[in-house]
Swiss-Prot record:
The keyword Iron does not apply. One of its GO terms (molecular function) is glutamate dehydrogenase (NAD+) activity. It comes from the Eukaryota. It holds the Pfam family ELFV_dehydrog. It comes from Nicotiana plumbaginifolia. This is Glutamate dehydrogenase A. The keyword Cytoplasm does not apply. CDD domains: NAD_bind_1_Glu_DH. Belongs to the Glu/Leu/Phe/Val dehydrogenases family. Keywords: NAD, Oxidoreductase.
Length: 411
């Protein structure tokens, strides 16, 4: 089952739990707008090449649409649609005043020079600039994009609309980015993990962790878990994987990766197969990379007691069923990785106010939002006797449905 089918399935289950009428259910499922554009750029050698870009604006009942832009060769309309819908429910679960959107370009960033990436980003912005806006649709970084990408979008958009720092979040600090934004998703994952573990009388410092994916989110999660006394015993990324039953020295591993660009050959751990991280003996598994990594082929072999979904849609529905039957507690993506969009909201607020927060305030507010969201999620689960995943979807869908009804859009 692909990401869009799985997301639609979860939405329909939540709609049934809430007793939504069919007209409102259909209205919430259909995207507000789907944008598909062709972006043709000259390469550095003078040849022309075209890429297809997408922006799906799913829902704006609760506020401006919000979601990242990813550069990846497998980007397609179905994937972007699924991720846009997930953003609608995620922002509602976090209780920030946004709707959901997502964008992407089907390209391989590592095959493009910096100047080619800049040209591609600027052409994409030219194609969609009149369909995004500070109070309409606010992009952010995602897989394959970063603060520099956002700087190019900001600059290109400002050529048409004047200086508009709030048009994107995840920007460089010098252009109005927020302190704490780089670590926000990983930090939010740790706050979410702490909230969940507290319900079971457990603490990070007493547990072992396996982290699949060691990019921005995985690296920050590992660093913060290590600082709290947790034992990170296995880590993987696209270059390989390392393990140490006594706990990896995360600061040393981060330095090693920065110096070499890879995890293997790290002297403080043994090499392991990357796929084995998902089934490694540990207390807490944190998938931080691509979707669909937990599936019917490997779900039976997962040994973790808790799974924290730092990635988007890392668990397919078949695996979800298997894992739940095994008694594994899964903290769903639309709550667990909401730290990034929450601090994006803080950045947007700072830009609109023209008043910057210090990092301590950003982190304090993030903890407050993540903790409050967990308790709202827990209460929804108790009210409807459902899993954490369905509790999160029900919480998000209910908030969007209420806003839609109040606006009179369901008629």
């Amino acid at each position: 089952m692909n990401a869009l089918a799985a997301t639609n399935r979860n939405f329909r289950q939540a709609a049934r739990i809430l007793g939504l009428d069919s007209k409102l259910e259909k209205s919430l499922l259909i995207p507000f707008r789907e944008i598909k554009v062709e972006c043709t750029i000259p390469k550095d050698d003078g040849t022309l090449v075209s890429y297809v870009g997408f922006r799906v604006q799913h829902d704006n009942a609760r506020g401006p649409m919000k979601g990242g832009i990813r550069y990846h060769p497998e980007v397609d309309l179905d994937e972007v649609n699924a991720l846009a819908q997930l953003m609608t429910w995620k922002t509602a679960v976090a209780d920030i005043p946004y709707g959901g959107a997502k964008g992407g370009i089907g390209c391989k960033p590592k095959d493009l020079s910096k100047s080619e990436l800049e040209r591609l980003t600027r052409v994409f912005t030219q194609k969609i600039h009149d369909l995004i806006g500070i109070n309409t649709d606010v992009p952010a970084p995602d897989m394959g994009t970063n603060a520099q990408t956002m700087a190019w979008i900001l600059d290109e958009y400002s050529k048409f609309h004047g200086h508009s720092p709030a048009i994107v979040t995840g920007k460089p600090i010098d252009l109005g980015g927020s302190l704490g934004r780089e670590a926000a998703t990983g930090r939010g994952v740790v706050y979410a993990t702490e909230a969940l573990l507290a319900e079971y009388g457990k603490n990070i410092k007493d547990l072992t962790f396996a982290i699949q994916g060691f990019g921005n989110v995985g690296a920050w999660a590992a660093k913060l878990i290590h600082e709290r006394g947790g034992k990170v015993i296995a880590v993987s990324d696209i270059t390989g994987a390392v393990k140490n039953p006594n706990g990896l020295d995360i600061p040393a591993l981060l330095n090693h990766k920065e110096a070499t660009g890879k995890l293997i050959d790290f002297s403080g751990g043994d090499v392991m197969n990357s796929d084995e991280v998902l089934t490694h003996e540990c207390d807490v598994l944190i998938p931080c990379a691509l979707g669909g990594v937990l599936n019917r082929e490997n779900a039976d072999n997962v040994k973790a007691k808790f799974i924290i979904e730092a990635a988007n849609h890392p668990t397919d529905p078949e695996a979800d069923e298997i894992l739940c039957k095994k008694g594994i507690v899964i903290l769903p993506d639309i709550y667990a990785n909401a730290g990034g969009v929450t601090v994006s909201y803080f950045e947007w607020v700072q830009n609109i106010q023209g008043f910057m927060w210090d990092e301590e305030k950003v982190n304090r507010e993030l903890r407050k939002y993540m903790t409050k969201a967990f308790h709202n999620l827990k209460n929804m689960c108790q009210s409807h006797n459902c899993s954490l995943r369905m509790g999160a979807f029900t919480l998000g869908v209910n908030r969007v449905a209420r806003a839609t009804t109040l606006r009179g859009w369901e008629a």
